């Protein structure tokens, strides 16, 4: 996959990440972006979103607690992203349970742009039109055919698609990766997926190959999680240790420790 100094390039740029995200994990997303080396801006007012995207390095839209104002802001921001060539990451949190969120994704694809869709396996399979098991915002899916779902959805939206679970899957419609790092403790703290979406926005803001940048973001989260669990086996202390280890993560570490199968 060639030169893979994804984290180094991101930290050299210190990309400004415009986040329109949910109220549950907004603080976690801001803190993990800072620890990673990016600059977060949690700007969701619909009358500010268009202008702010024009000075941003990437736009992260998380649909977790989608209000009407956030919906309007997300659509306007995506239009600005298209006009100003700013990459967009979408996290379709809870889309199998709330069909309105699919309408919002399709509207963003129609009038704006989507570069990466990052969701759990249940959400991605649902968006791809495949049978999936979910409960609220959580996936109960066993991961069967997950890479196929990513590939189908990547072709539909002409973007990168990442599906997270016990294994993580990434596809650009032609190439793919399967990531086998991680720890179950990441499922015991609220917002691990939301934080990962923010990291995907940070890496894609400064690295051209978005399949590689997305894979690097997932490896960063998973390996930081593994290292955090070595020191902290309880959810509260683990959450703090996770951010500490994101602060210390490096390209050398993720590619040496990473268990990745390129497809």
From Swiss-Prot:
Signal peptide: none annotated. It comes from the Bacteria. Keywords: ATP-binding, Kinase, Magnesium, Metal-binding, Nucleotide-binding, Thiamine biosynthesis, Transferase. Its EC number is 2.7.1.50. Gene3D superfamilies: 3.40.1190.20. Substrate binds at residues 42, 191. The keyword Transferase applies. Pathway: Cofactor biosynthesis; thiamine diphosphate biosynthesis; 4-methyl-5-(2-phosphoethyl)-thiazole from 5-(2-hydroxyethyl)-4-methylthiazole: step 1/1. It is an enzyme of class 2 (transferase). GO terms for biological process: thiamine biosynthetic process; thiamine diphosphate biosynthetic process. Disulfide bonds: none annotated. Its cofactor is Mg(2+). Pfam families: HK. ATP binds at residues 118, 164. InterPro entries: Hyethyz_kinase, Ribokinase-like. GO terms for molecular function: ATP binding; hydroxyethylthiazole kinase activity; magnesium ion binding. The keyword tRNA processing does not apply. It catalyses: 5-(2-hydroxyethyl)-4-methylthiazole + ATP = 4-methyl-5-(2-phosphooxyethyl)-thiazole + ADP + H(+). Catalyzes the phosphorylation of the hydroxyl group of 4-methyl-5-beta-hydroxyethylthiazole (THZ). Belongs to the Thz kinase family. This is Hydroxyethylthiazole kinase 2. It comes from Clostridium botulinum (strain Loch Maree / Type A3).
